[in-house]
């Protein structure tokens, strides 16, 4: 489903990824760990099509993912519907005037009928228990509430792959338990998870395969 072949990436003269080989099958839950600065966040930005390999190849469902490929609007629309990326800092992906508008934004951009937009929006608000926040501006919410909204936004697109960067960081215990339960359910539904985390409980309960990045910006499966 997802294949990286000898992928390298550098910011100007600073290497961030060094000859990464990775293959992820549909329905796997891959945990990525490693020290700060080893390239983990760069790797998931590349998987989400935000940046592209300096060397090597990235394939998703046998399609090579390149900057040129994602300039095709139809292909880019398909790819970004497949890939759900939840940033560690939810503020970077919340920009609408209300929670309801935020959750509905993706389905509207997909061109879905109004009835389906409403249904997806209501389902996702209800799933994360944020129905009562629907009229609130996202910037007025707590960190945990923002994380729930950002996940609701991604789930409204019904992605095949969910990519998360430290999803439990900074959350209270109750919210952590709720999100962990959701992620387990998402995975049990046959979807694919790729998660960066230092949280041992999350890794042990969610991971089916484990990858470690080192200070040389290399990745090894363990």
Set out the residue ranges of the language-model regions:
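Catalytic Walker B motif of ABC-type/P-loop ATPase nucleotide-binding domains
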Residues: 162-165
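Conserved ABC transporter NBD signature motif
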Residues: 56-68, 79
């Amino acid at each position: 489903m997802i294949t990286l072949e000898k992928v390298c990436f550098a910011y100007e003269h600073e290497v961030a990824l060094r000859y990464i080989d990775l293959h992820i099958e549909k329905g796997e839950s891959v945990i990525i760990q490693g020290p700060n600065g080893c390239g983990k966040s760069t790797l998931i930005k590349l998987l989400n099509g935000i940046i592209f390999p300096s060397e090597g190849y990235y394939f998703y469902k046998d399609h090579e993912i390149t900057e040129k490929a994602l300039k095709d609007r139809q292909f880019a629309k398909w790819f970004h519907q497949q890939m759900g990326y939840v940033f560690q800092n939810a503020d970077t992906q919340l920009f609408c005037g209300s929670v309801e508008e935020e959750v509905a934004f993706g389905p509207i951009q997909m061109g879905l009928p109004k009835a389906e937009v409403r249904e997806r929006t209501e389902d996702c608000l209800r799933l994360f228990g944020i129905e009562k926040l629907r009229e609130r501006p996202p910037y007025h919410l707590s960190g945990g509430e923002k994380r729930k909204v950002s996940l609701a936004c991604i789930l409204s697109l019904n992605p095949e792959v969910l990519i998360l960067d430290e999803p439990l960081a900074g959350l209270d215990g109750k919210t952590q338990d709720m999100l962990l339960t959701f992620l387990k359910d998402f995975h049990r539904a046959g979807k694919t998870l790729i998660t960066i985390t230092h949280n041992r409980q999350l890794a042990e309960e969610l991971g089916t395969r484990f990858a470690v990045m080192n200070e040389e910006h290399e990745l090894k499966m363990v």
